[in-house]
Structure formats: structure tokens, C-alpha cells
Regions:
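Short amphipathic alpha-helical boundary/capping segments
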Residues: 1-2, 130
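Short, cationic-aromatic polyanion-contact patches
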Residues: 2-6, 19-22, 52-82
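Hydrophobic residues on short alpha-helical segments
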Residues: 7-14
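Short acidic, hydrophobic short linear motifs in intrinsically disordered regions
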Residues: 18-30
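Basic amphipathic alpha-helical segments that dock to polyanions
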Residues: 26, 36-50
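Helix-turn-helix DNA-binding motif, specifically the short coil turn and the N-cap/start of the second
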Residues: 33
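Exposed, interaction-prone assembly regions rather than primary DNA-binding/catalytic cores
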Residues: 74-160
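N-terminal, charged low-complexity regulatory/assembly segments
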Residues: 161-168
Length: 168
């Protein structure tokens, strides 16, 4: 069974496919333990999101899961107004494709964040730290949040942008 950190690891591998990596380096980048990354890679391979032999993302399967399944497997949990990092429709790249609204922005709670808005619990607790270190991963994670929490239009646009990024 997939765990939220499996998505973080899989998205990191998708963001940097073709680049060499080790479990230790990936763990450091994502704020996880090496054994946690290893277990995440194994689970993602078992579920068909990564090739179990090459440990590379199976992009069509990953995209299908993100567009059609992630919001049901890892539902969004909204909270009170907090300081944090922008996500979902409030963050680039999704915000560039949608008309601005006057609603409160969505943020992952994060002490080093520069925005205030309605909090959205990230897929796992290390997401803001990892996203702060890696702009490509940040873009993918915010698009996934657009799918998890957005209305029909936001989900449609997020799926389109995610498809474009993952098909590169």
C-alpha cells in the first residue's frame, strides 16, 4: 500500500529523471531517512509507479495515478490561516494559468514561508523543506495539491500542466 512519502520520493525521481542518485543523497534532499527512501522506492515499484529494476518513474502510470487517484488516496485536509509556502492554485506554475481570485491563498504550514493563507496539510511533513530546496519538485507538488484540493477547473488545468511537465 502506498504511503504519502512514496509520492514525494517518486515525484523527486520524476523531476530529476536521468540524474544519478543514491538513497542517502535522496534522503538528505527530501528530509527523510535512507531506509525510508528505500522503502518508498520499493512500494512505488510494487504499485507500478516506478520500474522495480531501474528505479525510474513509469510516467504514464504515475500521471494516471496523479490525475485520477491521488485526491482519493491522499485527500486534502484544510486548516486555519497560517504562515507558510504557497501551494495549489496559489503557487506557480498553476497560478499562471488561472485568473486571480480574491480567496485566501493556500499554504503548507512552514516557519520559513513568506505567505499567509488557509493551511493545507502537505502529503507528508517534509514536503515544505524538500520543496524549498528544489524548484522542480515544488512545481510538481503544487500541481498535485491543485488536483487534491481544487475544483473542477483547477483540477483540469493542474492535470494539463502536470501532463506537460511529466511528458518532457
Amino acid at each position: 500500500m502506498l504511503k504519502p512519502q512514496d509520492m514525494l520520493v517518486t515525484l523527486e525521481l520524476a523531476a530529476h529523471e536521468g540524474e544519478p542518485w543514491t538513497y542517502e543523497a535522496l534522503a538528505s534532499e527530501l528530509g527523510m531517512s535512507a531506509s525510508g527512501v528505500h522503502a518508498a522506492v520499493d512500494r512505488a515499484g510494487t504499485c507500478g509507479l516506478l520500474n522495480p529494476k531501474t528505479r525510474t518513474p513509469l510516467r504514464p502510470a504515475l500521471l494516471e495515478f496523479l490525475v485520477h487517484g491521488v485526491r482519493y488516496v491522499f485527500p486534502a485536509e484544510l486548516g486555519r490561516r497560517r504562515r507558510g509556502m504557497l501551494t495549489g492554485a496559489s503557487a506557480v506554475p498553476l497560478s499562471q494559468h488561472l485568473a486571480s481570485t480574491e480567496t485566501s491563498p493556500l499554504v503548507w504550514p512552514y516557519a520559513r514561508g513568506e505567505a499567509r493563507g488557509e493551511s493545507l496539510t502537505p502529503l507528508c511533513e517534509t514536503v515544505p523543506i524538500a520543496a524549498d530546496r528544489d524548484p522542480e519538485l515544488y512545481a510538481l507538488l503544487t500541481l498535485v495539491d491543485g488536483i487534491r484540493v481544487g475544483g473542477a477547473r483547477v483540477r483540469e488545468v493542474a492535470a494539463g500542466v502536470l501532463t506537460e511537465l511529466l511528458r518532457r
